[in-house]
Structures are given as structure tokens and as C-alpha cells.
Amino acid sequence: MSEIVNCLIIGSGPAGFTAAIYAARANLSPVLYEGVLPGGQLTTTAEIENFPGYPDGVSGSDMMEDLRKQAARFGTDIRFGIVTEADLKGDLKRVVVDGEKEVLAKTVIIATGASARYLGLPDEAKYAGEGVSACATCDGFFYRKKTVAVVGGGDTACADALYLAGLCKKVYLVVRKPFLRASKIMQERTLNHENIEVLFEHEVVGLDGDNGVAGASLLIRRGQPDEAAGHIDIDGLFLAIGHQPNTKVFAGQVDLDAEGYIKTENGSPLTNLPGVFAAGDVADPVYRQAITAAASGCKAALEAERFLLTME
């Protein structure tokens, strides 16, 4: 016989654990499945200094462990497992964990996050948290007065380059195309900044360094009859080539936008399906901060509580 739970939370980042804290305190007896990366993306961040309550900063893994303990303290049933199937359209939502265990839920909070798109280099995993980052506002502070590179050509890449230019000695903006895709004003600010050097028609194809990133190998197309090799000395590499929301298992059920993010109603966690709520980066293509994810997790739990009251 399948297990039936009041509130099923899928994902264990700031959104998922905050939802769990609020749901547990409301006596909803939440069950949380941690997913592929327990603790979410923040576990790969060396230090967080912009989350309230940590005046001396905290490592991403330590902060997520604090949130996990707090959720467990109030009675959240935290389980390791990956949701591999989902049918969310009925009164009881059905999910399958790890391809075998079936769980039925009266409410579901989707907090599966969004994964940064990476370049696919063999060395990226090696340098994760040691010089490769997908969040300039999270990690840029640690590269003060150093040299870094940003990969990308859109608004996010330009914004990251401008942000880092205020901290770093030098910023390379590595762009595959011969032009920027960013808005005109962002292009102007980026191209005119004295600390930013834009490398058009360049592509990062390798990383090197014994203790963290020390350099990047480049493939150069600009001004070359054939592709040429190049190299830049850098202390960090920031990726700004987009994020991929982790919504594949929910496609065809919850409404998604063109990029795959879950559509919600007017800034709330409400989705198109009654009893199904979305929180954190999985529904946020704009801010993608730990504090905004936590706030949306709180809202999702409150909405789940209200929904369950209407079912009584």
C-alpha cells in the first residue's frame, strides 16, 4: 500500500528546507526528499556573507547543515532519494522515488532548483568551488584585487563583469560570438569600463592550476584565418551562460515558461495545479539568491497549510 503524506517537499536547498521548517511547525508532518545534491547548489559555495544571521560569514555546506538540523528539529522526515516520476494532477499527487517507491501526497512543494549551465570542460568538476563559479554576487568578494574571467555575452554576463570589475584588478569577458547579446545600456557600460577587457570570438577550452584555477586556455577565432590557441592568467572563472531549471520530471503537468521554469501566479508559489506549489530557483529566473529562495519556501509552506485547511 502506498504511503500518504500531507506535505511532500521535493528538494533540499534553502527553499526546500525553509518550507520544511514552516510546514513542520504547522504540524503538517512534511516529508522531504533531498534529491541529487543534498543541500543544493550552496553546498559548493566556499563562503556566504550575504545571508542574514551569519555576521562572520558561513560556508555553504555549513549553512545548509544548519537549515537541515532546524527542519529535522521540528519533525521533518528528511529522506535521501530522487523523484523519478510524478503525476500531480489528481487530488492525491503521486510520485515515484528512485524508480521504485511510490508516495502519495495531499500537497507538493517543488523546490528542485536550477542548475547552472557549464561549459562541459573535463576540468570544471575539479575546480568547482576552487576557482569555478556560476554566481558572481555569491563568490566575487573572494577575488578582490585579483584577475578573473566571465564567460557569456548576455545581460547576466555583462552584469557579472561589471560587478566583478568593482572588486577585481581585471576582468576578462569571454564571448563566443562577435557581438554582445546584452541590452544596449549594459553593452555600453561593459565596453567602456576600464577594468573589463572583452574578448570577442574567444572560447574557453581548458583550465589549469595546481591549487585552484590559475589560467584558462582559449580558442581564438577573431581575426584569424584559422582557429588559434591562446591563454589568459586568471584566478577565477565565472560562468554566465544561463541556468537550467530542474523541471524535466514535471513537464507536461505544471505550466513551464519557454526556459523551463515553473510559472507561478503573481509572485506567489501557486502553480496551475491545485495543491502543487513551487519555491526557489525552479520558479525564479531573475534573482536566484539564497534569501529569496528561502522566502519563497516560507510562502509555499503557508499556502500548503491553507490548502489543506480547505480540504478538511
Set out the residue ranges of the language-model regions.
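Beta1-alpha1 glycine-rich phosphate/pyrophosphate-binding loop at the start
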Residues: E3-F74, T147, G152, C158-K184, ...
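Phosphate-coordination loops involved in phosphoryl transfer and adenosine-cofactor binding
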Residues: I4-N6, F80, R144-K146, E201, ...
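Short amphipathic alpha-helical segments
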Residues: A20-I21, T44, G120-D123, A161-Y163, ...
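A Rossmann-like FAD-binding core segment of flavoenzymes
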Residues: A71-V97, E102-A105, G166-N266, R306-E312
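Glycine/small-residue-rich loop that forms an oxyanion/phosphate-binding "nest" at active or ligand-binding sites
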Residues: I78-R144
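FAD-site-proximal beta/loop scaffold in flavoenzymes
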Residues: G120, K126-F142, I241-Y287, S296, ...
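An active-site-proximal "capping" alpha-helix that borders the catalytic cofactor pocket
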Residues: T292-L308
